[in-house]
Amino acid sequence: MRWWTATLAAAICVLAAGCVSTGNAETTTPTQTLIPRPLVERELDSLLLSPEEVNVAMGTTGMAVTDSQSAFADNSATMSPLECLAIDGAAEAAVYANSGYRAKRDESLNNGDDFTHYLKQAVVLFPTVEMAGAFFDASAQQWPTCRAYTHTQSGSQWTVGRISNASATLSTVAPQQDARAPGWGCGRALALRNNVIVDINTCSADPADSASKIAGQIADDVTSRW
């Protein structure tokens, strides 16, 4: 009957307020690392900035959506050399070919008849964080190979500025040579967060860090989604 005596003693110990252990065992709480879940396709549209947010980021007014796409553009035949296509514009088909991406959303915006500001904002979904990271790493190797390029239809020439790679974001500015006053240039930014690539192209007389700023806002939104 010893098993019954032991069971009864244990039950009494649980019920009694004064029953304590005098052992020296320490209780440890396991540390868990929270890993963000991969984003899914239905979330992509909500990542893009509103026209009002774009106005603030680009320091202008009147920005409005002129085009929305879920397929990639292909401007590979209108610029040279081809290795500069990734810097010339965001979300290009030839750039993402064979990358394994799953889905994409993009919007183009400008400020109407004035057309002093332009934005193309794109978010590209990959099946895994690793695949998105591989695309970013390949881009980080490829971007510096471009120094200058030409739009073959218009004959306009562009010079690529210093390329920054910091905090999982590539960025640069490419001014158009011999542009009419007050000038024209385009900013580029490519950011990696979770299983999403944020791909931004901004153009104005002085794009400065507008592409990086917009990419950062969208990237922060990606990071906040658990």
Regions found by a protein language model. Name each.
Residues 20-107:
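N-terminal "mature-domain start" segment
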Residues 99-137:
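A short acidic-to-branched-hydrophobic micro-motif
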Residues 119-122, 191-204:
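Short, well-ordered beta-strand elements
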Residues 69, 140-185, 225:
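Short Gly/Thr-rich strand-loop-strand
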Residues 201-226:
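Surface-exposed amphipathic alpha-helical segments
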